[in-house]
Design a protein with these regions (language model features):
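Second-shell loop/turn segments in exported
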Residues: 33-40, 127-135, 245-246
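Flexible, glycine-rich surface segments
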Residues: 160-253
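Sec-exported extracytoplasmic/periplasmic mature domains
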Residues: 51-59, 150-153, 265, 269
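Bacterial Sec-dependent N-terminal signal peptides
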Residues: 1-24
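A cross-kingdom marker for long, charged
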Residues: 29, 211-212, 216-303
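Start-of-domain marker
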Residues: 22-88, 99-101
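Acidic/His-rich structured neighborhood in mature extracellular/periplasmic domains
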Residues: 85-197
């Protein structure tokens, strides 16, 4: 009887660990329609292995309850298969977080990576080592796991994502000799190297400050005080002008507005005219690519 009670106690502790240990609730999809003549079960197993790697691994020392896990998705579109086990394509990474005291979920990151190139061998486990060598697939998934965590933590506390961004930067540094693209500065200005470079660059610290103030002091306040929350978002976006005027046309700025342009218009469209003009002047300066969307902010309201 005593042994049985001890067994159930150990089982309870073990189950509690697995319920609370993992940080991500990441939906994975692998689209392989462009690849012909391949065993489709291979891609089912590939998707399952990626899902288990991201969702079952513990990425930090922090404890998450089941309903606190970070909502995210990774959509992989494979364009070609080289040989039996090498694949190339693109990846869309999307991260969202709940807004306090509401049913609304806000997008933190909506990022497209066009430099996806990895080897996947069926039935070979995906294992990550912080000190040893990893496959490019494992490095890709670990890099984005840390980016996802870092962005989420930044939205709840000022510079809260530092540890995760440091780990992502370490992964990039270790991949400088990789034959696969996306890791190096000279390949193009919009890849993994420049994403983490911008996040770690002190010149863009005001962008990360904006992420915190926009979400924690702005969106999270709006259910209790709409005016104060909207004003905090206005002031947060004003910080982006500081970064833009120091180093214009940054990749990080584009990544921010890819996630936020539509939401900003939705938040400020009901505001008073002077407030709408202020926000229009900010966002049209720092994000001219979405100027057609922002024009809705200065259109006169009709009854």
């Amino acid at each position: 009887m005593l042994k049985q009670r001890f067994f159930y106690f150990c089982l309870f502790i073990l189950m509690s660990y697995f319920v609370t240990a993992q940080e991500l609730r990441c939906n994975i999809s692998v689209s392989s329609q462009k690849i012909q003549g391949t065993n489709r079960e291979l891609f089912t197993n590939m998707q399952r292995d990626m899902y288990e790697f991201l969702n079952n691994k513990r990425w930090s020392e922090n404890i998450f309850q089941y309903d606190e896990r970070i909502e995210c998705s990774i959509q992989i579109t494979l364009d070609e298969q080289i040989g039996s086990d090498q694949f190339r394509g693109s990846m869309q990474v999307r991260v969202s977080r709940p807004v306090y005291n509401s049913s609304y979920s806000t997008v933190l990151l909506n990022f497209r990576d066009n430099d996806i190139d990895y080897i996947y061998r069926e039935f070979e486990p995906l294992e990550y080592s912080e000190t040893g060598q990893n496959s490019n697939l494992v490095n890709l998934l670990a890099f984005y796991a840390n980016i996802i965590l870092g962005i989420d933590y930044d939205s709840f506390s000022l510079m809260g994502g530092n540890d995760f961004f440091n780990r992502a930067e370490t992964i990039v540094a270790r991949c400088q000799n990789a034959k696969e693209s996306g890791w190096k500065s000279f390949e193009n200005r919009r890849n993994r190297y420049w994403l983490i470079n911008n996040l770690q660059d002190r010149s863009y610290a005001s962008v990360r400050e904006c992420i915190y103030k926009y979400h924690r002091l702005g969106l999270d306040v709006m259910s209790d005080n709409l005016t104060d929350g909207r004003l905090a978002i206005l002031e947060a976006l004003g910080l982006l002008q500081k970064a833009h005027r120091i180093k214009p046309n940054s990749y990080l700025m584009q990544v921010f507005f890819d996630a936020k342009a539509d939401e900003i218009v939705h938040i400020f469209k009901p505001a008073f005219t002077d407030e709408r003009k202020r926000i229009f002047n900010i966002v049209s300066e720092v994000n001219p690519a979405n100027s057609s969307k922002y024009n809705a902010l200065i259109q006169e309201k009709t009854n």
